[in-house]
């Protein structure tokens, strides 16, 4: 008799209007209830019935009321959906289409679904991977949630899923852009290309590399100085700023590098053929010649020019490294001419490396972890590749080339695409000094560490220490690297200027710098200058690509290490992060990241403290682990659904009865 009673409805509305309301974000749990997080210190419990109106991540206004002597939140108004476009798996419930989002906090959420027009629902099977969108939401007045499937990514059991799903998740392309039938060189009529085909340039790359974008030549002078010439592939010879292909390249930003495969920024017929500096093939190139002193100082005689070049030798990193390090390579024996060039390049690189070690910042050597895949996308092996002498030779050449470009772009235009880093965050300077000065022989000052020279001095001092604890801690006080259209220093490298132009096949920013360098050569106005948004655009692309690379890696690690907990395989692991819940480590053998909860170090909250600010783990107030430490671990869990690893130390800290505060260590 009370149903649809307008007086009751009015009374209910009046009561609700008098109740307090809070705005916040929904945090779901696996147990059906949730929380309204108002700020970092305030949250309200949401009972399971109210959670049916919202999903994890929704920004809402909720009524705060007291139920069973407890304040609870009832979501009332949707401000912003937390879930719009998402990746999901098909779930058939009594033959009807449903989807389950592929998200750790949403695994229990099963949503009714429909296929969009043009997508046949009969093609969707249990477990298939799809892209879906929320099209109905209870807080918008709809009767429950409804998802629309817009795209099928791949079948449930397809081994390519880690790549295709991750790319779809980040809204990234999974194939190269479509090329054109007839590429034509579109050089400015006044651009003269110097014939450099007689110069014995060499390329040094991985054995499987196809998009070879740099060739090198060096000659040691009688006085010990080096004449270095860097030749870089020239895709802007074929692509003008107003071409459709330029728009595609800008939208992609970079070639996407994922474990086991890449997605090119440019069509493969350009990247792997017409622009690739293939041995004995004439190619258009943008070149830079500069003198580097025997002490590693880059001279003022920087000269950029356009050329036609020919690679005289296609070399591989490992073969060149073997030859440089041992005097011989089983798979490669250079001619006398090529041997002399490689030797001169190596000596140049050693001089530059020594200069950077003394005057700039050299990053510590860490292995590159590489997945070896079978033809059907199974992981055959994970290789830890150290940067060897040939890799460092190329690296020093590229860094020198990019310093040259930075100088020229700054002097000619005061504009370009520059890689920048501003050092420490201004609000963290006191923290930096409090951390390092008790350890440093000569105390640092705030005035000193805000300068490029002082920052580099501090970084070099950190690099000289016999452990990486302070280095790991201080990273949290540093600013993020940026891409700017105005010249600025790169503190993290210890360089006053840095503008990349050495990978135009793979980086859109390098294409812009090529066009500006050609304008410098021609003494003309550039056909393209970087606008104010390009830095943020490229940084966002780089962030999404980095996330995709990590996500695919996590998936492959979970597959590869699935049996490690049962087999109790022992790994050496380095601590790279500590927070109040535990610590994150990297397995040195394969590069996998794992989490060690505090409870798996010692299951006694009274005795153990994981301190994220200090970067330490203490038991009974005595430090047992710190950032940078290497310890032995075993994996206790490999979660295939969430693609994460949980580890525990083999060192056991016994849970002692109350008494003298000592730690009792045993071996697992």
UniProtKB/Swiss-Prot annotation:
Gene Ontology biological process terms, A to Z: mRNA catabolic process
Domain of life: Bacteria
UniProt KW Cytoplasm keyword: yes
Residue stretches making up the S1 motif domain: 568-650
UniProt cross-references to InterPro entries, sorted A to Z: CSD, CSD2, NA-bd_OB-fold, RNase_B_OB_dom, RNase_II, RNase_II/R, RNase_II/R_CS, RNase_II/RNase_R
Entry-linked PROSITE patterns: RIBONUCLEASE_II, S1
GO cellular component entries: cytosol
Domain called RNB: residue spans: 193-521
Family: Belongs to the RNR ribonuclease family. RNase II subfamily.
NCBIfam families documented for this protein: 3_prime_RNase, PRK05054.1, RNase_B
Name this polypeptide is given: Exoribonuclease 2
Naturally occurring in which organism (per UniProt): Vibrio atlanticus (strain LGP32) (Vibrio splendidus (strain Mel32))
UniProt lineage: Bacteria, Pseudomonadati, Pseudomonadota, Gammaproteobacteria, Vibrionales
């Amino acid at each position: 008799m009370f149903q649809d009673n307008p007086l009751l409805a009015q009374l209910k509305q009046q009561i609700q209007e008098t109740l307090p309301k809070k705005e916040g974000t929904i945090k779901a749990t696996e147990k059906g209830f949730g929380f309204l997080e108002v700020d970092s210190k305030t949250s309200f419990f949401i009972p399971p019935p109210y959670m049916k109106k919202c999903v994890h991540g929704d920004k809402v206004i909720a009524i705060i009321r007291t139920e069973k002597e407890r304040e609870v939140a009832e979501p009332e108004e949707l401000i912003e959906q937390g879930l719009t476009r998402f990746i999901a798996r098909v779930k058939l419930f009594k033959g009807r289409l449903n989807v389950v989002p592929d998200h750790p906090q949403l695994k229990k959420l099963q949503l009714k679904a429909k296929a969009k027009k043009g997508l046949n629902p009969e093609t969707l099977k249990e477990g298939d991977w799809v892209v879906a969108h929320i099209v109905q939401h209870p807080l918008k007045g709809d009767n429950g949630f409804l998802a629309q499937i817009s795209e099928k990514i791949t079948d449930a059991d397809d081994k390519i899923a880690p790549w295709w799903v991750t790319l779809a998740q980040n809204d990234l392309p999974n194939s190269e852009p479509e090329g054109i039938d007839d590429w034509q060189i579109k050089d400015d009529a006044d651009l003269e290309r110097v014939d450099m085909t007689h110069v014995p340039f060499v390329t040094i790359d991985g054995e499987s590399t196809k998009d070879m974008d740099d060739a090198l030549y060096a000659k040691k002078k009688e006085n010990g100085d080096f004449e270095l010439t860097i030749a870089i592939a020239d895709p802007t010879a074929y692509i003008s700023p107003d071409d459709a292909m330029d728009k595609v390249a800008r939208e992609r930003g970079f070639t996407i590098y994922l474990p086991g495969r890449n997605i090119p920024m440019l069509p493969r017929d350009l990247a792997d053929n017409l622009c690739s500096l293939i041995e004995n093939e004439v190619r258009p190139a943008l070149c830079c010649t500069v003198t580097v002193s025997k002490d590693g100082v880059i001279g003022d005689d920087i000269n950029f020019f356009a050329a036609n070049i020919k690679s005289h030798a296609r070399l591989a990193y490992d073969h060149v490294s073997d030859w440089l390090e041992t005097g011989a390579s089983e798979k490669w024996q250079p001619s006398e001419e090529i041997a002399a060039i490689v030797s001169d390049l190596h000596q140049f690189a050693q001089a530059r490396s020594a200069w950077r070690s003394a005057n700039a910042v050299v990053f510590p050597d860490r292995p590159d972890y590489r997945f070896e895949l079978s033809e059907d996308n199974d992981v055959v092996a994970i290789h830890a590749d150290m940067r060897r002498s040939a890799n460092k030779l190329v690296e020093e050449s590229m860094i020198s080339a990019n310093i040259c470009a930075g100088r020229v772009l700054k002097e000619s235009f005061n504009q370009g695409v520059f890689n920048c880093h501003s050092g420490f965050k201004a609000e963290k300077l006191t923290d930096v000094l409090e951390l390092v000065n008790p350890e440093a022989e000569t105390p640092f000052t705030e005035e000193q560490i805000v300068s490029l020279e002082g920052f580099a001095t501090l970084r070099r001092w950190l690099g000289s220490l016999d452990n990486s604890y302070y280095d790991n801690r201080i990273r949290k006080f540093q600013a993020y690297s940026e891409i700017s259209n105005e010249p600025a220093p790169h503190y993290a490298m210890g360089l006053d200027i840095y503008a990349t132009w050495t990978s135009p096949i793979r980086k859109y920013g390098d294409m812009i710098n090529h066009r500006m360098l050609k304008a410098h050569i021609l003494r003309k106005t550039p056909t393209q200058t970087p606008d104010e948004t390009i830095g943020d655009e490229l940084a966002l692309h780089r962030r999404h690509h980095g996330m995709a690379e990590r996500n695919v890696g996590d998936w492959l690690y979970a597959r590869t290490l699935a049996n490690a907990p049962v087999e109790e395989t022992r790994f050496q692991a380095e601590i790279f992060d500590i927070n109040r819940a535990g610590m994150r480590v990297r397995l040195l053998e394969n590069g996998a990241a794992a989490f060690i909860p505090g409870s798996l170090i010692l299951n006694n909250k009274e005795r153990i403290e994981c301190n994220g600010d200090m970067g330490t783990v203490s038991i009974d107030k005595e430090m047992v682990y710190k950032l940078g430490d290497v310890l032995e671990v075993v994996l206790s869990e490999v979660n295939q659904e969430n693609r994460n690893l949980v580890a525990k130390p083999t060192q056991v800290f016994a849970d002692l009865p109350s008494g003298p505060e000592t730690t009792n260590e045993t071996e697992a």
